[in-house]
Amino acid sequence: MSMTFLEANTAVTGPGQIFELIDGEVRGVKMKVFKNAPAHLGQVFAGSRGHGDKTFLVYEDEIITFAQAADRIDALASLLVNTYGVKKGDRVAVAMRNFPEWVMSFAAIISVGAINVSMNSWWTEDEMDFALEDSGATVLICDQQRFDIGAASCVKKNIKVLVVRAEKPLPAGIDKWEEVLPLGDKHPGADISPDDDATILYTSGTTGRPKGAVSTHRAILSSIMAFSARNTIFQMSGTKLKDVDGPEVPTSFILIVPLFHVTGCVPVMLSCFVAGLKLAIMYKWDPEKALEMIEREQITNFVGVPTQSWDLVNSPAFEKYDTSSLRAVGGGGAPSPTSLVGKVNDKVKNGNPQLGYGMTETNAFGPAITGSDYLSHPTSTGRASWPMMVEVRDENLKPVPTGQSGEIWFFGPMLIRGYWNRPDATAETIVDGWLRSGDLGRLDADGYVYVEDRVKDMILRAGENVYGAEVESAIYEHPAVHEAAVFGVPHERLGEEVGVAILVNDGMTLTPEELWAFLDIKIAKFKIPTQVVIMSEPLPRNAAGKFLKRELQQHVVKGTLKAASR
């Protein structure tokens, strides 16, 4: 007989259990913390050597074992400290596509007490320059393409550069990974505490520039442990998974999202480090390539954004490949259409649909749902397991009654410390240890969370957060633009795409093509509006003077405003 959800949480996190919770204090706030969590991530990386000759990373035709990865991590740690002079608390930026070197760089940086700055590999030169300046990075580890984009910034800021997989001769003073990595060197060690900073992940900014979300070692480890505990809690509380038809296979992950995103970094990559699991790395998303890798590598866990699940099950090549190894298909980053839940369940023989509602600011952890629970609650994002707590609050920050709508707030040891160099944004987002999500929703009597709308002016495009203010800031740099309002336009595959309505200055002209050419060098491609409306009259505003973006969106959807498409 299954337990209630509360009983399962109590049993899994009780005294004597691996996931035992005890009273603790984090940044002056009392909360439950994991008794048996490692003190810092360096212990996880050092411990991974114990997995020895087990396969860790698979990339194209390359196979790297845990022991081989550990040797390279130790060598890079030595290089960072002994050659580049990296000290505890220094920021080291990583900017590259999904390569094995990203994984090893992350581990080496954090294990010497430095802070890993994860840079979006789709950024333009201007965006990359801002993050290097804002973070105060002293070293950049990057691939060839990111070096070409950021080289001038590094020269200007006197940043040391290490290039992986260089495709052409490098300028004097720029190091090549394969030539300078001192294999055989021992790890220099570091004195690291649980509440020391470990990572900075940049999120799109609500006021024009990205914000660096800072996580401590404790926060990241709390998230990893909470993910592990949650699986047991769900099964003990009655969530039924499919009976496997066929042989059991070892748990493994396919990396289909960028490592600079929290999903790729924490629940996927770091889970493999902790549990000694295989991680098959995709350079970029391609559904047929993913199907081929799933069959060849016998992948069990497919964790991405709903767009990728949609691509997978709708691929014309789906029936060509054996996907019977899959046990979990889904992820987070955006709400999932209810039709997709059923389609994944029907098409993936042994795979269970799943959804997680996490954020960069929660280290990807949050309410989640899978298996029979998801099929019976397809519009919910699930329930939060301990030590996370969820509340729905009104505009006065007071909890609302069950079933009523309000803003969703999170609490727990997995939350970020705050935003780098942004005490204003930190104070606005984190109040008495509780983090505001920016999403509107409700909780039902059984604790299921339902996300209904957004407080934030944000578009979710294929799992990427795009803030209207950031895109508008770039658009307003064009001299012809008088007014600009950015909004989301529904899209079957992407969830949403970016739209904009523009009024040009008197006596000036601007075509959509001219706008696209202007923005191509200003902001990352995924932020550039693909639906552009050039208005002949001022944009609609409310009594407070704010643009009526939902009204503009509806006009574009209905076709009463004609948008040029890219």
Spans of features found by a protein language model:
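Conserved pre-ATP/AMP-binding loop-to-beta segment of ANL
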Residues: G184-Y202, G208-R209, T239, V244-S252
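Gly/Ser/Thr-rich phosphate-binding loop
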Residues: V274-L277, R296-G304, V313-S376, M389, ...
